[in-house]
Amino acid sequence: MNRGRGVRKRNAPEKASILETCDEEIRAEVAQLFNKVRSYVPPAGEKWTLPDPNVVLCDPHVSHPRLQALKHSLNEVKNQLSDKDLSVWHQHTCFTNRAGTVTSHLRSTTNAELCTQAWAKFYEILGTFQLLPDSALKTGELNSIHLCEAPGAFISALNHFLKTSSLHCDWNWIANTLNPYYEANGRGCTITDDRLIVHTLPWWFFGSDNTGDIMLQKHLLELPRFVSNMRSVDLVTADGSFDCQGDPGEQERLVAPLQHCEAICALLLLGTGGSFVLKMFTLFEHSSVCLLYLLACCFRSVNIFKPGTSKSGNSELYIVCLDYQAKEQIRPLLSKLIRNYGPDLASTASLFPRRCIPDSFLSQHEEICTFFQALQVNTIQENLRLFVCMSTEQRRRLEQLREYAAEFYTKRFSVQYLPRKSWVCRGGVVRWVKVCERKQMGSLNQRKEMELQGWKQRLAQGNYGPFIEKHLVAAEGCEVVLNGPLDECDLGAWFALEGAALPKVCSSIFCDQEMLDFLNEALEGNLRVKTVNWSLKALPTCSSCSSDSPVSILSEICSHPDVTSCLVLGSQSWCDDKLTGVRIQPEFLQGPSYCGVQNVTMHDGQPDYQLELLNAVLFALQKQDQGSTLVIPLSSALTRFTSGLVFTLHLCFRYITFRCLSGWPPAALVCMGFSPPSALPSLLDFLQNVMEKMKKVELGRQVLQFVPLEELLRGELPHFLSSFNTAVIRQQLHMLIQLDQST
């Protein structure tokens, strides 16, 4: 063999960067993509001033003909999308989006943490504007507050910017969002992605009622105390919105109250010279005119910016306000706004009368709206044309544009590599990943038609239909095992967390959210469920399903050779017959009474039920002998409170499993092999204190949690709870289908 013979293999020439090889037309288009900005500037010799507080919130809303014409024209174009399947259209517009590959490029080249579209947008804002005040950078202390921030991409983007830009400062941040762990927060407004939140909980402000709702006046007044350790607030961001896909033409009007609350919060918190970034959408309504005029009177520079990484076909805009100058002048007006603060702010009366808006400001505003409306209309029309037919050449050019835009972004904004040790969450990703959020499917017209259908029809047409409707050939639960006892935990970190009483369990981090939505709708809509004398015990059993009964479960447990004793948290009536042919007889201990018809969507969130359950578990743990078994009938474990009790049992037993039942409650926890931890006396004392606190909690409030979330979300517990709740919800939905068919 000739191995080389002194001949060196030539290296292939490096591929030239697309930044060097693409044509001028592509360069110009991408440069324009990242240059969509307009500013408000008072005419020479004119000063825009704040209106007198006495005229604030006094006059009815008015409409501006030119702006309404722009709105009508835009909605006419958007109406052409009403028959487009949302998932298909989304896939198409992702490809036509010139900046569509920026985030994937950043992930692979810069190691950006939580690199979402929001990350790219905020990094672009940081690279376009002098957002961080010079005064903060000179003193070496930067303080930022991030409203409506979930999942946390603005925070991770700012961290990346600071760590890679040689800006040496002590950065402190606080964030707020609707609490993804508060069980009464629905999914229409709440972002459940908690990848950053779960690692940084002490820095998140959820308010005294634990909801995280920044539109509550008491939370507005509590927030300054929460950030009181900050010398001055230098930056406030507000990225709030909620699902408007059911009425996309009125997105601006629907989100306006939230935007007003975000702006008032920023004006209250910011120090002189600070910056404010506010997400808005179209700016056609008088409410938007007033809000922008307020900001223009308070900041030296107010800019309307459409990031290149924001999809060009949507209405999203960012208001970038620099150098807060009206900290003292705005106090009287701000006091009135704070007195009227809440979800109805500016809904019935306009912030300012039309006469207080200078013509020079309104003229600039109309020009700005015309500019951004034209960009959006042109994008939608192009997407519609390409949706019908896209040539090979058009596809090739789009691919070039996307590749060039990704390289251009990285170079233009100097995005550098950041090692993982410099991330906000240095520990990396959380071990427990919840089920993904629901994606809207079908066209707008189809979704409106589906809204008119009953839950059964929508369930049958969706992905869950076969799973819910199938009959069980074997009892559920015994194959799911939570092994323990858990290692010792830090009881010193446990505390009883109070908040607003739950009116309904709308969400849970320990279940499939869409299945819970279906169950709540089914329970609320079923005529027999609404009947005063109806009880959940009336749910029929399915003759085609294989399921366990309390008798069969207890017979199996009490015949097991390793079981020395068995305690059941429930009255003798739960098990209809006396067990025969078993080694031992179970002992029954009075358990909780199960909530009646008026609380069908409270599940395990009813405070009285939780108190009874805690009392029963506390008493049972005191009666347990080494190696004994505990059986707990349960309706569900959706809440943090009940999950905390399961965690407590996880500390004390060798393993826990569950069984679904043919009756009510729909399942039972089976805790095998009592093995008390050394800290059991302290644990029992703590639970006793929680119980005493629950008895004294004031009206309208509730103990929501007593085990830290960091504990609840580690190890195998979340998977066990999710399996348990999924099985319980599936069974109840299956039974409710049978109930409907029998009527």
UniProtKB/Swiss-Prot annotation:
BP GO terms, sorted: 7-methylguanosine mRNA capping; methylation
Active site feature: 121, 239, 279 (proton acceptor)
A Pfam short name: FtsJ
Residues the entry annotates as binding S-adenosyl-L-methionine: 152, 171, 239
Keyword Nucleus: yes
Subcellular location: Nucleus; Cytoplasm
Name of the protein this chain belongs to: Cap-specific mRNA (nucleoside-2'-O-)-methyltransferase 2
Enzyme class of the recorded protein, top EC level: transferase
First-listed, main subcellular location of the protein, grouped into a coarse class: nucleus
Catalytic activity field: a 5'-end (N(7)-methyl 5'-triphosphoguanosine)-(2'-O-methyl-ribonucleoside)-(ribonucleotide) in mRNA + S-adenosyl-L-methionine = a 5'-end (N(7)-methyl 5'-triphosphoguanosine)-(2'-O-methyl-ribonucleoside)-(2'-O-methyl-ribonucleotide) in mRNA + S-adenosyl-L-homocysteine + H(+)
UniProt entry tagged with the keyword Protein biosynthesis: no
Originating species: Danio rerio (Zebrafish)
SUPFAM superfamilies to which the protein is assigned, alphabetical: S-adenosyl-L-methionine-dependent methyltransferases (SSF53335)
GO cellular component, as recorded: cytoplasm; nucleus
